[in-house]
């Protein structure tokens, strides 16, 4: 099978029904950060504690503006002697420009890596299938492993899967020999929605503080004990003064159309429908089920009913996320 990305589009499947699948992640991009001041610089820019990030771990963190609103969220990890992060391609250029604003005063180089290829491997027996290509695979305890030109990231949610930062030669070999079905970024997006990992595309950049997208519920995503970083005051206020009234939800059901990032939905109140929320991402699955990731008021009743705007005869309901939103005070 010839290697050519993006792989042809198939309707995504849920993690419970997904066969072994190799996924081209063309909707995501990679940025590298190198130089002696890299750790210190990133520590002053993102919500995670970069100084505590082990070489065998990755973390979903946020890069905020001065008001605590996220330019984007970043999947940060060590790559060789440097740091790297993955984010949605639609926000990458603007986010990187913002991150570079004060870099002139530090010994750090920030650049998009156009040569690296991003692939996902997920579905049934994905660990077993990958083990014939790499001598060591990451797991929950050692979530980042490097082998030659490839860095492998492990994810436990919604079920075991792997993200590979690699080169063309390895991608060609995997495409040819993995004996997996192929799919494009929509499949990985569906798995991220199921996992409760917030998706920030361009339409929602600088719209939400991290807690509105549940980032504080993901291990290491927001550190409230580290030193100053851009937007810290607003992020801390949301926690300690209860200023955040929003949360991120996963909705599932039927819809005749797929909403776009930035769209609102409708919430059923008696026999009326009221506009609510902001869509982060949405996908239609192979069984016609529609999944939507949306930010709404964080006091929504679990039995609430929603729909895409003006989508009569269809409805969506709240699904349980695989993590707790209860915070330590």
Swiss-Prot record:
<dbReference type="GO" id="GO:0008033">
    <property type="term" value="P:tRNA processing"/>
</dbReference>
<dbReference type="InterPro" id="IPR029043">
    <property type="entry name" value="GcvT/YgfZ_C"/>
</dbReference>
<dbReference type="GO" id="GO:0005542">
    <property type="term" value="F:folic acid binding"/>
</dbReference>
<dbReference type="InterPro" id="IPR023758">
    <property type="entry name" value="tRNA-modifying_YgfZ"/>
</dbReference>
<feature type="binding site">
    <location>
        <position position="28"/>
    </location>
    <ligand>
        <name>folate</name>
    </ligand>
</feature>
<keyword id="KW-0819">tRNA processing</keyword>
<dbReference type="InterPro" id="IPR045179">
    <property type="entry name" value="YgfZ/GcvT"/>
</dbReference>
<dbReference type="GO" id="GO:0005737">
    <property type="term" value="C:cytoplasm"/>
</dbReference>
<feature type="binding site">
    <location>
        <position position="188"/>
    </location>
    <ligand>
        <name>folate</name>
    </ligand>
</feature>
<dbReference type="GO" id="GO:0016226">
    <property type="term" value="P:iron-sulfur cluster assembly"/>
</dbReference>
<dbReference type="InterPro" id="IPR017703">
    <property type="entry name" value="YgfZ/GcvT_CS"/>
</dbReference>
<protein>
    <recommendedName>
        <fullName>tRNA-modifying protein YgfZ</fullName>
    </recommendedName>
</protein>
<keyword id="KW-0290">Folate-binding</keyword>
<comment type="function">
    <text>Folate-binding protein involved in regulating the level of ATP-DnaA and in the modification of some tRNAs. It is probably a key factor in regulatory networks that act via tRNA modification, such as initiation of chromosomal replication.</text>
</comment>
<dbReference type="InterPro" id="IPR048451">
    <property type="entry name" value="YgfZ_barrel"/>
</dbReference>
<comment type="similarity">
    <text>Belongs to the tRNA-modifying YgfZ family.</text>
</comment>
<dbReference type="Pfam" id="PF21130">
    <property type="entry name" value="YgfZ_barrel"/>
</dbReference>
<dbReference type="GO" id="GO:0009451">
    <property type="term" value="P:RNA modification"/>
</dbReference>
<keyword id="KW-0963">Cytoplasm</keyword>
